[in-house]
Amino acid sequence: MKIRKANINTQTGMITDVYLHENRKELRTLVAVPQLEWSTIISYEEDKATLPERLEASLRRHTEETPAGELAKKIIHWVTEM
């Protein structure tokens, strides 16, 4: 498990911790943002072209549009570097 610092400001406060758990056996990564009560699973085989759109749409249900876009970009960066 890795904990990354997002440090993204929202109207309700700052999003700080993003938890990443890489499951190499099942070929996927679990991503969780406890402050938003949000999580998702990203498969190694998932289409990288549609991933940003999927993450942003999911995050927008829990926060504003601009922070959702910033956070999605950071998550993609962290997941692809693992």
From Swiss-Prot:
This protein's name: Uncharacterized protein YueH
Pfam families the UniProt entry points to: YueH
Gene that produces this protein: yueH
Top-level taxon of origin: Bacteria
